[in-house]
């Protein structure tokens, strides 16, 4: 029997895609801020050509997560996870947290020149 769809996978995919989209820019700054150094940090720029693909994947995953989480409770059968109010509230909070992280990650390359 398959597990019911609850939007958790789409949230994870959106967050992962956002991290990958900003890895070329945010990664080196975070590593330098943590005290790491070395020429290998420059190798993260190899991900730059794939940034539009990662951005698209993040936005598509967030759209599907939003569609699954914000759907009406009437679409849920009684006893399913999506019918429990506390779980719905938790998923909505996690969704908005991930959405803000995605926006920060997507906007970071435009703010990055102020730090270097």
Swiss-Prot record:
Pfam short name (any one): MerT
Topology versus the membrane: Multi-pass membrane protein
GO cellular component, one term: plasma membrane
Keywords tagged on the record: Cell inner membrane, Cell membrane, Membrane, Mercuric resistance, Mercury, Metal-binding, Plasmid, Transmembrane, Transmembrane helix, Transport
Cross-referenced Gene3D superfamilies: bacterial mercury transporter, merf
Ligand binding (Hg(2+)): 24-25, 76, 82
Predominant location category: membrane
Function in brief: Involved in mercury resistance. Probably transfers a mercuric ion from the periplasmic Hg(2+)-binding protein MerP to the cytoplasmic mercuric reductase MerA.
Protein name: Mercuric transport protein MerT
Gene: merT
């Amino acid at each position: 029997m398959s597990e019911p769809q609850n939007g958790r996978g789409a949230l994870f995919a959106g967050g992962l895609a956002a991290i990958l989209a900003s890895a070329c820019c945010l990664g080196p700054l975070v590593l330098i801020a943590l005290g790491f150094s070395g020429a290998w940090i420059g190798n993260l720029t190899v991900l730059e050509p794939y940034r539009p693909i990662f951005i698209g994947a993040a936005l598509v995953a967030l759209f599907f997560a939003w569609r699954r989480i914000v759907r009406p409770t009437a679409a849920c059968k009684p006893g399913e996870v999506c019918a429990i109010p506390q779980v719905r509230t938790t998923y909505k909070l996690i969704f908005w947290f991930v959405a803000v992280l995605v926006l920060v990650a997507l906007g970071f390359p435009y703010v990055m020149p102020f730090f270097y």
